[in-house]
Amino acid sequence: MNGAEELPEMYDYDLIIIGGGSGGLAAAKEAARFNKRVMVLDFVTPTPLGTRWGLGGTCVNVSCIPKKLMHQAALLGQALRDSRNYGWNVEETIKHDWERMTEAVQNHIGSLNWGYRVALREKKVTYENAYGQFVGPHRIKATNNKGKEKIYSAEKFLIATGERPRYLGIPGDKEYCISSDDLFSLPYCPGKTLVVGASYVALECAGFLAGIGLDVTVMVRSILLRGFDQDMANKIGEHMEEHGIKFIRQFVPIKVEQIEAGTPGRLRVVAQSTNSEEIIEGEYNTVMLAIGRDACTRKIGLETVGVKINEKTGKIPVTDEEQTNVPYIYAIGDILEDKVELTPVAIQAGRLLAQRLYAGSTVKCDYENVPTTVFTPLEYGACGLSEEKAVEKFGEENIEVYHSYFWPLEWTIPSRDNNKCYAKIICNTKDNERVVGFHVLGPNAGEVTQGFAAALKCGLTKKQLDSTIGIHPVCAEVFTTLSVTKRSGASILQAGCUG
């Protein structure tokens, strides 16, 4: 057209999202709210054992949701035992039915998968169960499970592919071991189980497996819960050991062999010490690997469009607006470099990104003071800095740690676990004793932590906590009466529920 300005290229979509997990779906639905043409590509590569699942990503299918439900199964077993002391006549032997539990959990997950499909359809988001790979600028190839390929174009792209469990790279690991991707839909009870790893996934799974009555051993290479407050991590480990979970420390598996096939079968694990030549062997019905997760970024054609990744970790560096080094490509969730790997973070980031792209918003995702909970038998809630990080950031002389054990009233009648629940706050003495770290070990830790997380966002100080009247008799009230500092070395042991 003579003299006319060149028209912009017409794309099939305004936004194509690779990954149908919590973050990707949140971004898709939010972008659709602003009448944008949105497509979601989601594809689950089966595990080495062949496990696959529906729309919704890791959290819904193979992490937070089934994990919390199975943790609840274990808590109910403890509640049944406690109930005898409260006058209930409960049979001496309590049996757990694995198949019944997994069927109920999988039925619930199935309803969630269906709900996500319906929500996308209602919001006019195009969904394809296909594997997305960049093939050129603004272009992506979608391959379905039958191998059929289609090419789509979009003005902008969002990578929200998440992570998958890492394997050891030893003989027998992919042939005979399971991961958390397999555990929650395992069609038979795992029996005597070895959990390899010290991640929160490892300890949570070990905890509920032991809680439903299984023989559980955890093999740990170095420390528990790397990245978390180590004082809290060690208390979790001690509590798990006291409740029958065995720990093999400073060993790593070097070979897994099948002794007998079956559901479950029998496996032999050969492991080597991390600091000597010592070799040990053990027999288990199931070996579950929980040694970490790897970002799903290496096989989606990023090199074709020039998106930079950290070659060692596969993580994607982004700006504070989740933009990659390629301006029209964004990324959110667990695949981001140096960001918190949590579902609600991905959801928040996805929503806010869509609002910035399509609604003129300037609000960015705040990755500071993100609360989290580890659902070990004794739950661990945290917000803000670990003690180690606080010392590193402010200097040991500029922090004050207030702490106390506490005994939930409900546990006094069965007379169990006194001086196991623990509360700790870390304060910056140079900033009006502002609370920079909040940590609690006890029942319902997530429920306790959530409200305090809002307070930390508002700049909570020790004085404000002290002037807050507690609710009696609940666990959270301990935070309104903390008076003993770690520095003082004074006793924090409790004689009763009211301190």
Swiss-Prot record:
Major subcellular site: cytoplasm
Membrane-traversing stretches: none
Phosphotyrosine, modified sites: 131
Descriptive protein name: Thioredoxin reductase 1, cytoplasmic
EC number: 1.8.1.9, 1.11.1.2
Enzyme class label: oxidoreductase
Record carries keyword Transcription: no
Family matches, as Pfam families: Pyr_redox_2, Pyr_redox_dim
Keywords carried by this UniProt record: Cytoplasm, Disulfide bond, FAD, Flavoprotein, NADP, Oxidoreductase, Phosphoprotein, Redox-active center, Selenocysteine, Ubl conjugation
Primary role: Reduces disulfideprotein thioredoxin (Trx) to its dithiol-containing form. Homodimeric flavoprotein involved in the regulation of cellular redox reactions, growth and differentiation. Contains a selenocysteine residue at the C-terminal active site that is essential for catalysis. Also has reductase activity on hydrogen peroxide (H2O2).
Compartment annotation: Cytoplasm
Cofactor: record remark: Binds 1 FAD per subunit.
Intrachain disulfide bonds: 59-64
Catalyses which reaction(s): [thioredoxin]-dithiol + NADP(+) = [thioredoxin]-disulfide + NADPH + H(+); H2O2 + NADPH + H(+) = NADP(+) + 2 H2O
Location of N6-succinyllysine modifications: 68
GO cellular component, one term: cytoplasm
GO biological process, one term: response to oxidative stress
Family: Belongs to the class-I pyridine nucleotide-disulfide oxidoreductase family.
Alphabetized GO MF terms: FAD binding; identical protein binding; NADPH peroxidase activity; thioredoxin-disulfide reductase (NADPH) activity
NCBIfam families tied to this protein: TGR
Cofactor requirement: FAD
Active site: 472
Binding site for FAD: 22-23, 42-43, 58-59, 63-67, 131-132, 161, 200, 334, 341-343, 472
Posttranslational modification: ISGylated.
